[in-house]
Amino acid sequence: MRETSVHIVSLGCPKNLIDSEVMAALLEQAGCRIVSGPEEADILLLNTCAFILPAREESIDEIFRLAEWKKAGKCRHLIVTGCLPQRYGAELAAELPEVDLFLGISEVPNIADHLRVLMEGKHSEKNRVIVTNPLFLMDAGHPRLLSTPPYSAYLKIAEGCSNRCSYCIIPRLRGKARSRPIEDILREAEDLVDRGVRELILVAQDTTAYGRDLEGKPTLALLLRELAGLNTLAWIRILYTYPTGLTDELLNVIANQDRICSYLDVPIQHIDDDILAAMKRRGDSHLIRNSLERARAVIPDLALRTSLITGFPGETPAKFHRLIAFVQETRFDHLGVFPYSPEEGTPAEKLPRQVSQRTKETRRNLLMEEQAVISHEINQTLVGSLQEVLIEGPSSSPDYPMIGRCRRQAPDIDGLTYVKGGKQPFLPGSLVQCRIVAADDYDLFAEVISSPD
């Protein structure tokens, strides 16, 4: 396969992105050349998402887009991997003859072997779809070709999910929760830091469930203490926590370790107790409120992000107004809202009192409008404050020529910090002390007060 060129498109969440990075590195080790555009590629590889309807639609659209390159260019084969074939492999094969090979989630470590067989013409129609039980769990021995900027990387600490939310298909796609041993995670983290990574972003389906399946039941708090000992690492950020997992031990570790950002992503989905029960979420509204209040009390200057679902079956106007009142009261720093997507095979799909798509979208928009006001007000309170900013690169603004993120901002999902002053340009990955001089709904504007570290 030497000099075979491969173009990889990765859709969905950061956890899926890591799978794509592993496949890219394995293909490169096998002699392939990873290229940035489909027009350069012999092989097109699409790693898909199938979590909700919009994700499936995006995946199908991308298959058709890449298939056009296959028809028109030098591309020889189109491979589709990930959650979509894991869920619909046989159906996809019947409907999409343009695709040469469909691979499920457990085939990530075998990608080079599959490509070799495909290029040798040994793949038959019978094994055009290869989907097995989702048992793959990456370890530090799996290489990664980072697709994120070199100063920031995601670190997958577990795979799968043992929560049984009534609306969610993830346990069927990814299997039960499987945690990586602390020693293995530390090996990968050390390698990433040696490669220049300054920000590690911990991800899993539920990061606070980390270790429950391992002997000795190590906790996320213990893992964080170990990671915080990596000397040249600047920031550790935690995504995908669960309200019931915000233990005092975890909150105190975040509060007392300088390298851990005062930032928590806590998807709560709803606040109405009837809706939470129908969702089969662990914990009620009292637990959610208590968890968030404790987090803010323990961690100074905590930035809170959450995700919500609108239009879940049974969400009456009164229940929705309870949700919007909670958002107004709690004042999250960052918020994502998703209209409920009925997923085939989930208990929620069969619930009575389904809500119209139009109502779901309207309620989502109302929440986001309210959040824009809240975010603007919170950002205004930051004007005059000192913030450490991780420089990402040049911006398009002549007034603020550099762009970055402060500890309150996760990549891709939160706002940005625009930077002026100092001896610019700064190298991407530099940490700069800044004073916030202005703010809008989602972004901050800062002036450098000290040189990069």
UniProtKB/Swiss-Prot annotation:
<dbReference type="Pfam" id="PF04055">
    <property type="entry name" value="Radical_SAM"/>
</dbReference>
<feature type="domain" description="Radical SAM core">
    <location>
        <begin position="147"/>
        <end position="377"/>
    </location>
</feature>
<feature type="binding site">
    <location>
        <position position="49"/>
    </location>
    <ligand>
        <name>[4Fe-4S] cluster 1</name>
    </ligand>
</feature>
<dbReference type="GO" id="GO:0051539">
    <property type="term" value="F:4 iron, 4 sulfur cluster binding"/>
</dbReference>
<keyword id="KW-0949">S-adenosyl-L-methionine</keyword>
<comment type="function">
    <text>Catalyzes the methylthiolation of an aspartic acid residue of ribosomal protein uS12.</text>
</comment>
<feature type="binding site">
    <location>
        <position position="13"/>
    </location>
    <ligand>
        <name>[4Fe-4S] cluster 1</name>
    </ligand>
</feature>
<dbReference type="Pfam" id="PF18693">
    <property type="entry name" value="TRAM_2"/>
</dbReference>
<dbReference type="GO" id="GO:0103039">
    <property type="term" value="F:protein methylthiotransferase activity"/>
</dbReference>
<keyword id="KW-0479">Metal-binding</keyword>
<dbReference type="GO" id="GO:0006400">
    <property type="term" value="P:tRNA modification"/>
</dbReference>
<dbReference type="InterPro" id="IPR023404">
    <property type="entry name" value="rSAM_horseshoe"/>
</dbReference>
<feature type="domain" description="TRAM">
    <location>
        <begin position="380"/>
        <end position="450"/>
    </location>
</feature>
<dbReference type="InterPro" id="IPR002792">
    <property type="entry name" value="TRAM_dom"/>
</dbReference>
<feature type="binding site">
    <location>
        <position position="165"/>
    </location>
    <ligand>
        <name>[4Fe-4S] cluster 2</name>
    </ligand>
</feature>
<keyword id="KW-0411">Iron-sulfur</keyword>
<keyword id="KW-0004">4Fe-4S</keyword>
<dbReference type="Pfam" id="PF00919">
    <property type="entry name" value="UPF0004"/>
</dbReference>
<keyword id="KW-0408">Iron</keyword>
<dbReference type="InterPro" id="IPR005839">
    <property type="entry name" value="Methylthiotransferase"/>
</dbReference>
<feature type="domain" description="MTTase N-terminal">
    <location>
        <begin position="4"/>
        <end position="120"/>
    </location>
</feature>
<dbReference type="GO" id="GO:0005829">
    <property type="term" value="C:cytosol"/>
</dbReference>
<comment type="similarity">
    <text>Belongs to the methylthiotransferase family. RimO subfamily.</text>
</comment>
<feature type="binding site">
    <location>
        <position position="83"/>
    </location>
    <ligand>
        <name>[4Fe-4S] cluster 1</name>
    </ligand>
</feature>
<feature type="binding site">
    <location>
        <position position="161"/>
    </location>
    <ligand>
        <name>[4Fe-4S] cluster 2</name>
    </ligand>
</feature>
<dbReference type="InterPro" id="IPR005840">
    <property type="entry name" value="Ribosomal_uS12_MeSTrfase_RimO"/>
</dbReference>
<dbReference type="InterPro" id="IPR012340">
    <property type="entry name" value="NA-bd_OB-fold"/>
</dbReference>
<dbReference type="InterPro" id="IPR020612">
    <property type="entry name" value="Methylthiotransferase_CS"/>
</dbReference>
<keyword id="KW-0808">Transferase</keyword>
<dbReference type="InterPro" id="IPR006638">
    <property type="entry name" value="Elp3/MiaA/NifB-like_rSAM"/>
</dbReference>
<dbReference type="InterPro" id="IPR038135">
    <property type="entry name" value="Methylthiotransferase_N_sf"/>
</dbReference>
<feature type="binding site">
    <location>
        <position position="168"/>
    </location>
    <ligand>
        <name>[4Fe-4S] cluster 2</name>
    </ligand>
</feature>
<dbReference type="GO" id="GO:0035599">
    <property type="term" value="F:aspartic acid methylthiotransferase activity"/>
</dbReference>
<dbReference type="InterPro" id="IPR007197">
    <property type="entry name" value="rSAM"/>
</dbReference>
<protein>
    <recommendedName>
        <fullName>Ribosomal protein uS12 methylthiotransferase RimO</fullName>
        <ecNumber>2.8.4.4</ecNumber>
    </recommendedName>
</protein>
<keyword id="KW-0963">Cytoplasm</keyword>
<dbReference type="InterPro" id="IPR013848">
    <property type="entry name" value="Methylthiotransferase_N"/>
</dbReference>
<dbReference type="GO" id="GO:0046872">
    <property type="term" value="F:metal ion binding"/>
</dbReference>
